[in-house]
Amino acid sequence: SILQKYHPTPDFQQAFKHEKSGNFVMKYASGQALVTLPFFIVGHMWASNSTIYPADGFSFPYHFSVGVGLFLLSLLGMFYLRKVLLVYFKDRTVAALLIIYVIGTNYINYAAVDQAMTHNTLFTIYALLLWMTIRFYIAYESRYAIAIGILTGLATLIRPTEIISILIPIFWGINSISGLKTRIDVIKKQFSKFVLAGIFFGLVAMIQPIYWKIVANEWLGYSYGD
């Protein structure tokens, strides 16, 4: 079996057996799997055309493709963080801040060693979300609203508590009561854009309830099963 061949975990606790359906249900939300899917597909194509590695989802091509893909995703997050910071600070200041961030946090570990963890994926999503929010309040274009909806939905799909990410585009730049009143006026005038963002948020976030419905015949589930 996969467990005996690759020993991916000392104790198979990533899923639990659902009592009513009899199916195994993954404990973790599906967002990270969705993010890694393109890289997994590359690994699968590699393994499927290889005479050395089995196309079983766990051989070297999968590890390599997912690892490199998520490493590049971490770099994308750094790229967009720089773009966000340059809106407010000079280039030298931004360079110093990025260096401090890289050497003073776990960024390198989650970029180059533990890429499959959600930390740097969420880092990149938040960097993109900040950038799309800034652009939205400059141009009020539908494409930015759609991006905001997808990014907040994906963050929630990765870690449900990240639903708080929706507060960023709603309250971004508000630092006074008058600013809050202005934002309310903006929401009224650009209501269709906010609805559009909400629709795409829902489309992405609904992936998790759909998964639960398919495997456990329940729209809402407590995935840890204890």
Regions found by a protein language model. Give the residues of each.
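Interfacial juxtamembrane loops and adjacent helix segments
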Residues: 1-68
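Membrane-interface catalytic loops of GT-C/OST-like multi-pass glycosylation enzymes that act
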Residues: 26, 110-120, 158-160, 213-226
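Transmembrane-helix signature of polytopic, membrane-embedded enzymes
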Residues: 48-57, 76-105, 124, 138-148
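Aromatic- and kink-enriched transmembrane "portal" helix at the membrane-lumen/periplasm boundary
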Residues: 54-77, 98-128, 132, 153, ...
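Membrane-interface transmembrane helices that cradle and orient dolichyl/undecaprenyl
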Residues: 129-145, 179
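Membrane-interface alpha helices of multi-pass inner-membrane proteins
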Residues: 144-159, 166-170, 202-203
